[in-house]
């Protein structure tokens, strides 16, 4: 699963305060669940018994009662909030002693009738709701054997939610969809809502005759009645956990994408009425990606069909349901002409991720949520590989390194999770969908794949999947399969990265003794940025380390595993003392590297000669991190970025932009802001002005992707008067004619114009917002409205979050855009304090958790305390809220410490400009 975005400009800001990825691109960290922390009880009183309290079983259901298969029939009209359903569940009872109650999940459902048959005998039963559970209390205790349960119930499909069964309206037409991962199948039907319960499902949907009905499996039978309704029965599915069940109802257009894969499965795109042409890219890329994955697994796609559905109004994200993958419409659909390059590439990456899940997660499912990494880490890791094979010109090996850096940004926190975090609450389950599980997990897999060898690693994965196909598995099962193939126990080394949080900091010092070959003296400790409350009390990692070096004009490579606090790597192949050493060959190691002595100076002197783009990118990422930890002077990091920069390489320019842009405004004294602007203009100005805001015919896709970040930095941080004036003119032209700017550039233009904009521009943007229903235009306009710095105008923009004609979800970027900028931060947080409760009520329950992130944007003790005082009591009421707030406040502490430590070095560096 990839969760949705709030707009390209917002996620980097929100990511600074959540445990997800930090990026200049829309790669969101999933949010924890928002749920009051309550433990419900209920009294039961079977005939002849005194009333007794019913206490639900907690996180995991009673293992003595297991489902065997389940059939669900739903009567669903997307125009209506209420739906009706029946659930028929075959059960196996394993109790040694008779059971007085049977438990299953059911949330916000009203059970109207229940019948139970045990070993062929009917037993009177009461069905009582208790929190997120349903207690089945039989008239008399029931023992071992087989049972069948029939439940009739009603539920709700809400229009302001995006989990469970939810509804959306577009152009007067209504659609109903589902999102059950992680804990929301229980809102659609009573069930055993845990990943380890993997059973066949058969769904039947009774819908209006004019609506289409879709689910995981192909249609078995369809019957149209004289009453204007039809009944659509789907074939039984292979064994699936409840979170992978899915269905959709509505007047969808169907785009035939042909047949794909070894079995020639039918591939279709399902889109809201009138949007078929916008699915062209999705239909084009899905079949070849499926075939690339089949080749890697040497196994056919394991399901009977492949529908890909664009959720109307959905801003982003995706879910891997077998046979019915879902995407937010903004992620999946794009105009036939003038589409965003970044949207196309991110759709392809996300689709590769979701298709990889058909094996990782769907064919073989984790036994319990603490092994979520077996789903998400593997899908992210393989998506990078497959995209790089399919489109090598995209250089997704650089994107992999970027993702690694984003994961490390989250993993530096003392409050960060480990990849395999013990699950103690439902908040822990939902909190596991974060940058640690996705990004760190993928980076760790890439590191161990490189250490063990790609071919052996691939064979180990195939062995694991073959052994557990159509079933469930654990991390131990994966380790066992991989260890057999490589003939060594991989568990100890792997576990040091899976079972503890943090990033190793490996110090590397080149030593060239006269009486032996050159060597690298290695030491490791936990990376901790300045201001961190953490200590060095963890278990040493077993770090696979590969170094690349140049000695006497010849290149060499040496590898080892650093298992102790210190170690040595002998460079046997070096015939002389190396001119340079890169401590992380190919950028595949999950560690920050500190080049001791003159190691960094050697690399800088060589200007990165002979280094690949991923290796240069890793050096820049490490330099940023070492500045934050106090191990490298900020001037050294900025100088290194200039030395490694190749103006002709957009990926390296983007990396250097990230290094320079990472210096927060709060770190720079007001008197030196003009100096910083001159430094930025001097380094990037010529490139930015040549590139401009407007795409040129024949321009490469890489330049189109670079434009927003490069030109925005020079125009705003560099205060380039020419670019700012151009942005104002182009913004006004864009308001008249959307074709004057590519989608990739429009955000930077509108944001730059708005940052210095007046009331007239604000009014024009507001009018344009209210005049369009085009989701992409609205995203751009809302992003611009969040960029105004004038207090009155920024306040007017914030009030859109409460406007009845604006969806609070789409307006939320305004809040985070303003929180990210010092001039508007205090006002934005004040607005949130005034309107926290109405905002929370207007947002979906999961999304409202993100409001806790607002406290993480400050960089001073006074406002940190205000955030803690205001948000603390609210976080206590939400599952996962305390961890989310702790991470936000920890980031404030880091910023305060780094501001104090880095200012002197910045002052010295910027004084020269």
Where are these regions (language model features)?
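Bacterial N-terminal signal peptides
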Residues: 9-20
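Beta-strand-rich binding/interaction modules
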Residues: 112-117, 490-491, 501-584
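N-terminal, polar/Ser/Thr-rich
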Residues: 21-84, 171-175, 195, 491
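Long, ordered, helix-rich scaffold segments
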Residues: 404-405, 521, 535, 550, ...
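A surface-exposed beta-strand-loop module
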Residues: 102, 107-170, 227-228, 566-576
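Surface-exposed beta-strand/loop patches in extracellular or lumenal glycoproteins
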Residues: 88-108, 202-208, 523-546
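Hydrophobic alpha-helical and helix-loop surface patches within well-folded domains
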Residues: 25-39, 234, 262-533, 662, ...
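Extended, low-hydrophobicity, Ser/Thr/Pro/Gly-biased non-transmembrane segments
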Residues: 150-256, 279-281, 591, 613-621
């Amino acid at each position: 699963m990839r969760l949705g975005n709030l707009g390209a400009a917002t996620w980097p800001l929100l990511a600074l305060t959540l445990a997800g990825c930090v990026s200049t691109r829309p790669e969101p960290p999933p949010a924890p669940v928002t749920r009051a922390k309550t433990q419900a009880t209920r009294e039961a009183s079977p005939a002849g018994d005194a009333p007794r309290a019913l206490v639900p079983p907690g996180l995991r259901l009673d293992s003595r009662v297991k489902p065997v298969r389940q059939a669900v029939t739903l009567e669903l009209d997307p125009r209506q909030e209420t739906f009706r359903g029946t659930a028929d569940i075959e059960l196996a009872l394993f109790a040694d002693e008779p059971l007085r109650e049977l438990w299953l999940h059911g949330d916000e459902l009203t059970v109207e009738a229940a019948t139970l048959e045990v070993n062929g005998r009917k037993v009177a039963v009461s069905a009582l709701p208790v929190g997120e559970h349903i207690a089945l209390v039989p008239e008399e205790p029931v023992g071992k054997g087989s049972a069948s349960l029939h439940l009739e119930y009603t539920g709700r499909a809400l229009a302001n939610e995006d989990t469970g069964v939810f509804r959306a309206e577009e152009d007067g037409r209504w659609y109903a969809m589902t999102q059950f991962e992680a804990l929301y199948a229980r809102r659609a039907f009573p069930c055993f809502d845990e990943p380890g319960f993997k059973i066949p499902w058969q769904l039947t949907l009774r819908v209006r005759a004019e609506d289409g009905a879709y689910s995981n499996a192909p249609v078995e039978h369809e019957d149209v009645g004289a009453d204007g309704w039809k009944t659509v029965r789907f074939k039984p599915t292979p064994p699936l956990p409840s979170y992978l069940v899915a269905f959709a109802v509505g007047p969808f257009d169907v785009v035939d994408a042909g047949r794909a894969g070894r079995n020639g499965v039918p591939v279709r795109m399902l889109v809201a009425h009138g949007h078929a042409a916008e699915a062209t890219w999705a239909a084009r890329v899905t079949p070849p990606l499926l075939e690339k994955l089949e080749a890697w697994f040497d196994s056919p796609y394991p399901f009977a069909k492949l529908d890909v559905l664009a959720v109307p109004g959905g801003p982003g994200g995706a879910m891997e349901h077998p046979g019915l993958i879902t995407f937010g419409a903004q992620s999946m659909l794009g105009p036939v002409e003038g589409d965003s390059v970044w949207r196309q590439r991110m759709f392809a990456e996300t689709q590769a991720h979701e298709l990889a899940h058909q094996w990782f997660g769907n064919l073989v499912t984790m036994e319990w949520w603490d092994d979520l990494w077996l789903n998400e880490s593997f899908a992210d890791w393989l998506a990078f590989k497959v995209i790089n094979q399919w489109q090598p010109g995209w250089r997704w090996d650089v994107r992999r390194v970027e993702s690694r850096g984003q994961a490390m940004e989250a993993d530096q926190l003392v409050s960060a999770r480990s990849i395999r975090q013990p699950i103690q609450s439902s908040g822990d389950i939902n909190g596991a969908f974060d940058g640690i599980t996705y990004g760190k997990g993928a980076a760790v897999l890439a590191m161990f794949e490189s250490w063990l060898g790609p071919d052996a690693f691939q064979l180990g994965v195939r062995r694991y999947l073959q052994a557990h196909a159509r079933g469930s598995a654990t991390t131990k099962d994966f380790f066992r399969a991989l260890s057999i193939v490589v003939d060594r126990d991989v568990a100890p080394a792997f576990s040091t990265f899976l079972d503890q949080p943090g990033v190793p900091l490996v110090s590397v010092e080149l030593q060239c003794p006269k009486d032996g070959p050159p060597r690298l003296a290695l030491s490791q400790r936990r990376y901790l940025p300045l201001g961190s409350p953490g200590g060095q009390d963890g278990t040493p990692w077993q770090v696979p380390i590969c170094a690349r070096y140049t000695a006497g004009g010849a290149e060499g490579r040496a590898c080892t595993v650093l298992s102790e606090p210190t170690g040595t790597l002998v460079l046997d192949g070096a015939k002389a003392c190396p001119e340079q050493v890169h401590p992380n060959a190919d950028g595949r190691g999950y560690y920050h590297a500190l080049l001791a002595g003159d190691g960094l100076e050697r690399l800088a002197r060589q200007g990165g000669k002979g280094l690949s783009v991923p290796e240069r990118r890793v050096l820049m990422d490490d330099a940023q991190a070492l500045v934050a930890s106090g191990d490298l002077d900020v001037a050294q990091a900025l100088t290194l970025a200039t030395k490694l920069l190749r103006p002709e390489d957009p990926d390296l320019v983007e990396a250097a932009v990230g290094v320079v842009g990472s210096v927060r405004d709060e770190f720079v004294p007001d008197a030196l802001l003009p100096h910083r602007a001159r430094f930025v203009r001097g380094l990037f100005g010529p490139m930015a002005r040549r590139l401009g805001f407007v795409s040129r015919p024949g321009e490469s896709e890489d330049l189109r992707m670079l434009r927003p970040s490069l030109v925005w930095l020079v125009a705003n941080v560099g205060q380039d008067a020419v670019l700012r004036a151009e942005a104002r003119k182009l913004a006004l032209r864009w308001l008249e004619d959307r074709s004057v700017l590519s989608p990739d550039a429009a955000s930077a233009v509108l944001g730059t114009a708005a940052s210095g904009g007046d009331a007239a521009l604000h009014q024009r943007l507001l009018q344009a917002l209210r005049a369009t229903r085009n989701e992409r235009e609205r995203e751009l306009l809302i992003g611009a409205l969040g960029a105004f710095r004038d207090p009155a105008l920024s306040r007017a923009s914030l009030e859109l979050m409460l406007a009845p004609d604006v969806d609070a979800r789409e307006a939320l970027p305004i809040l985070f855009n303003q929180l990210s900028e010092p001039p508007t931060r205090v006002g934005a947080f004040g607005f949130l304090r005034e309107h926290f409760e109405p905002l929370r009520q207007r947002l979906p329950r999961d999304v409202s958790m993100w409001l806790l992130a607002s406290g993480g944007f400050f960089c001073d003790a006074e406002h940190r305390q205000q955030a803690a005082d205001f948000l603390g009591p609210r976080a206590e009421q939400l599952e996962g809220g305390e961890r989310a707030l702790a991470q936000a406040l920890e980031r404030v502490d880091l910023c305060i410490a780094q501001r104090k430590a880095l200012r002197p070095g910045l002052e010295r560096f910027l004084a020269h400009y």
